[in-house]
């Protein structure tokens, strides 16, 4: 969600701060700002909308100063505008904040009763007001910071700058991630290592309850009671990647076409291409002895987990409990230590998923993290890490991270089946061979289907509502297709299990309702065709996504039929992801929406 950067440097920092914010754009935002100290005075520039608005403002009205903080805001309290954009100033205190101050209403009332004047609608301003109040009362900056931290509740990462101490930044973490970066004669703070990667690869990740006092000479880390704590300094694997679309119009398009390559790279971590066998899974989780598996995630990652459930149950005969992370820990699920839990997150920082992870830890379960960021909080708090190796994903709507999650879950399910002795003789090699061939098949599909998808998207963009149907692993894929379309085109879309059509959704079917049916020629095909006939009988416009066998077997009239190669059931979800991603992408392009950063969405959701 919000992104934070801070620099205590030796040269002007404003442009460097804005450049670092560009590396946090993928998290989602609706406004941005930067502040510096120069000659004992603080100044700031803030702008609503895209970062180029802030960049232009800083270019027209430069900000001198070698110490500064910057922020991209995703609105939680108060509308997205310049006034509510960070940094917030109160009496010589500047604050940037990621998260939610849960008791801000109570604090705002208390401070207002004492005479404080609030100029924004944000929860963040209470932090600046409290710090200003405590320093007026005579507390030093460190003492004021600690008193404030023990007075606010919620999830937050904070960086604070005091006008009368121009060589120091104070920071704290209680929930959302925050990292300290070590340079030569300068120091950095950032929401993640990617933001700091142009400056340094030497990182310390703060943990919940840490407060860091950062100067040019280094960082002192204390807990919220003021006691010194030691945190490991490590070399980050994040690289200063170039934020470049290449020859593509959008990052999402680029990331769709990167999938064959990144999936091949991910698979090489989990399967042996020469022997056609799975590599041993992380030994921290013994799949052979498990009585069950819990899976939890949010959004697209949750839908990859739903597909993974089918695989673990089918190939490893392993019972799987799955729920969205925001509900998981509140259900009081009867868990036992003979189970393990997998948590799936592109960023590894999703707040609800982390909360569910910690719930399972308390229940004594071994924890596995399926993440794209090895240095994330989720990875650091897990017993086993299963990296998806998708590379940086900038588009808010996940594409390559989703299919890499699927590739990893498929590999783990086969590995679990091997460990548990539930695979038939020769089945491991057969399944691994399908996984090995998958990137080639996906590349072929991408080279063939775009013209048809693009033409179809023009027609689809005229409709206000769309249904997606599927059975088996195609049901979660229908949910994912609907999610993608609504995320980036803003067309209302819903996904259903095809067998549920008669239990309600069929009431919506008429000539104004496109119905996208995902149906490879598998063991569910004939039943899905029966559902298609029910749609056709009511005038629904069918878009049929199937394979060569399915196209030959169905004689129904459709609005369009997208025909893919015949593939094994194991890899079908990855291959069939491609047309639903491209369909959503091109529909959004025709509608003129912001494909890479759709309204109201954030890439990394770090608050509950």
Curated annotation (Swiss-Prot):
Compartment annotation: Cytoplasm
CDD domains the record matches: GFAT, SIS_GlmS_GlmD_1, SIS_GlmS_GlmD_2
Domain SIS: from-to ranges: 281-422, 456-598
GO biological process: carbohydrate metabolic process; fructose 6-phosphate metabolic process; protein N-linked glycosylation; UDP-N-acetylglucosamine metabolic process
Residue ranges constituting the Glutamine amidotransferase type-2 domain according to the UniProt record: 2-217
Annotated catalytic residues: 2 (nucleophile), 603 (for fru-6p isomerization activity)
Catalytic activity: D-fructose 6-phosphate + L-glutamine = D-glucosamine 6-phosphate + L-glutamate
GO molecular function list: carbohydrate derivative binding; glutamine-fructose-6-phosphate transaminase (isomerizing) activity
Record bears the keyword Repeat: yes
Free-text function comment from the UniProt entry: Catalyzes the first step in hexosamine metabolism, converting fructose-6P into glucosamine-6P using glutamine as a nitrogen source.
HAMAP family: GlmS
Quaternary assembly: Homodimer.
Protein name (database record): Glutamine--fructose-6-phosphate aminotransferase [isomerizing]
UniProt organism field: Agrobacterium fabrum (strain C58 / ATCC 33970)
